[in-house]
Structures are given as structure tokens and as C-alpha cells.
Amino acid sequence: MKTLYTAVSTAHGGRDGHVRSSDGIVDLDLRTPKEMGGPGGAGTNPEQLFASGYAACFESAMRVVARKQKLPLADASVTGHVSFNVTEQGKYVLSVELHGKVEGVSHEEAEALMRAAHEVCPYSNATRGNIEVKLVAE
């Protein structure tokens, strides 16, 4: 395996702390959402960061697949929904829904494009077999 890029971030204080990337571009306060018993308020959380990263990566994968398949992709967007869940056994797990909007192709083509992107997206490859990921073409 050949490494093309490595991102580095450091977190302090857990869900109610701070996260900063090595280059300082990401420099964010973290807050546990009220829904999870935290203070909420100004600050992000790991689920929002994961949803943002997965959505951006997946949309890029859709563009790569569309280019290879010569699909006319006028415009596209992906919205990531990352849920923090607890199983009946008390285990904490994430689940993901990716909602894709694709201009210039039929609904069936959009679904096929999302399925193909799911096979090449690095986030999809990392999560496959580990968490539930649902694809929704809108």
C-alpha cells in the first residue's frame, strides 16, 4: 500500500474538549449534544465531523465514477447522517445514511452511481462490514 496523504489531528478533553489539526486549519471546540446528556451549545462533535468527512469523500467518489462512466453530472451533493446508537447489549455503534442529490441523470442512474461510488469511496471501504450504511438517492 502506498500512502498518498496523512491527516493528523489531536483531541483533548474528549467530547467536551477541543480538536486541532497539525496544520491548524481544523481548530474546533467539541460539545456533547444535549440529546446525549451533554451541554450542547457552540461546538461540534465526532458524529458531525464524521458525517462531514464521509459526505465530502463520497461525493468525490461519485464524481470519479461519473467521469469514468461518462455520465453527465451537472451538479451533485451528498448529505451525511451519522447516528450514535446503543444496542440491546449496551454496545455503542454508529450508523450512516448518505443522501445523494444528482442533477442531470435519472433516479435509477443516481442510485447506480451511488452504489458504484460506495465500492470505491475510502470511507465506505473503511466502514464496510463494521457499521450499517444506507444509500438514499433523492
Regions found by a protein language model. Give the residues of each.
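Extended beta-strand/beta-hairpin segments
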Residues: 1-52, 59-138
